[in-house]
Amino acid sequence: MSTDKTNQSWGGRFSEPVDAFVARFTASVTFDQRLYRHDIMGSIAHATMLAKVGVLTDAERDSIIDGLKTIQGEIEAGQFDWRVDLEDVHMNIEARLTDRIGVTGKKLHTGRSRNDQVATDIRLWLRDEIDLILSEITRLQKGLLEQAEREAASIMPGFTHLQTAQPVTFGHHMLAWFEMLSRDYERLVDCRKRTNRMPLGSAALAGTTYPIDREYTAQLLGFDAVGGNSLDNVSDRDFAIEFCSAASIAMMHLSRFSEELVLWTSAQFQFIDLPDRFCTGSSIMPQKKNPDVPELVRGKTGRVFGALMGLLTLMKGQPLAYNKDNQEDKEPLFDAADTLRDSLRAFADMIPAIKPKHAIMREAALRGFSTATDLADYLVRRGLPFRDCHEIVGHAVKYGVDTGKDLAEMSLEELRQFSDQIEQDVFAVLTLEGSVNARDHIGGTAPAQVKAAVVRGQALIASR
């Protein structure tokens, strides 16, 4: 006869129930219930394996699997009663299974611990989340390629130090973000490889005495391999940290992009127009059209950075193997994945709808002596050392500042006062078109190179 006074699956060793506040404090079911689908997936594979090796009968396996599928239906229909006193998603599902099918439900946990169970659940969940995020990155990149192809020759100022530097094209600028997102994609693909290793079968920390077949279970669950050390398998959260690191870099890219969009929509720049559906107004100022989507993405970046630091701090002092600290791994991981996925979705919807204001961008590119480097390069081709050319053009720019003239607005006589090597053909390189067309190499801003880069980008996406 049971003498359990705790009403818990582990209560045999205890003589009094857990304090009510402690039960609530230590429970995780309020947030880990989102793992239910992956918990059930892992349990079905585990039961299938146990029957294969003879620990369960085929009838017991079938009863367990049918019960788990019914429970999944209850959860998805909103008919499942999540109980805090049962601590977590695992025990809630197991208790409901036992209620439905009787003592056979208690056999499911044979050869398994919640330590390897939760580690498996998180990896299964994160694997799916990475796939969703990769899909959103691809969708955003397609939008960037659309803009780059459409605006391959649309001239705008390029900046360093937020000062006018050299003319570029809007399409070239869009491709810069495409490149960053390609690296984000690669990082997440690499992260998925290390995530897709199965800890199940490690039990609490040392393995199990049952004749389990871990490779078979891994095959059922779509894992690439099984984890090689039971101690490491149950305590490893590197994959979650690595994901949050990759997510942080991706959010940093989106935050930088957001900053540019906020600047470009301002009255001081007016480079682009965002459709109304991506903006909001002011409760007091009737004229306002605020770029809330990029502003909010910029703000949400801090949440993902915080998740990374939270997980690093969580793990830094833990001895092997599993510790209750690891219950705190889920909320930051969940939040980082949700935030990145939603931010990418917002950008993927918004970017194709951006409308550049060509005349304003072109006018801005004409200000700030953006073709000064082209004049220096022109003189280099005339045989002068670059440093001498740099100084000559610096004097010409100073003259332009004093007289209010851009280099292209000066007469040949005015330009020749700085170097007698300057001839009439200089004006071909001082135009905006001449400047961008001259940068005709892989990675350059020439419209022909932008179009070629779009083709390469399309091929990259098609290869995924």
Curated annotation (Swiss-Prot):
Its EC number is 4.3.2.1. It is found in: Cytoplasm. It catalyses: 2-(N(omega)-L-arginino)succinate = fumarate + L-arginine. Coiled coil: none annotated. Keywords: Amino-acid biosynthesis, Arginine biosynthesis, Cytoplasm, Lyase. It comes from the Bacteria. PROSITE patterns: FUMARATE_LYASES. InterPro entries: Arg_succ_lyase_C, Argininosuccinate_lyase, Fumarase/histidase_N, Fumarate_lyase_CS, Fumarate_lyase_fam, Fumarate_lyase_N, L-Aspartase-like. Pathway: Amino-acid biosynthesis; L-arginine biosynthesis; L-arginine from L-ornithine and carbamoyl phosphate: step 3/3. One of its GO terms (biological process) is L-arginine biosynthetic process. GO terms for molecular function: argininosuccinate lyase activity. One of its GO terms (cellular component) is cytosol. Its main location: cytoplasm. Pfam families: ASL_C2, Lyase_1. SUPFAM superfamilies: L-aspartase-like. Belongs to the lyase 1 family. Argininosuccinate lyase subfamily. NCBIfam families: argH. This is Argininosuccinate lyase 2. It comes from Pseudomonas fluorescens (strain Pf0-1).
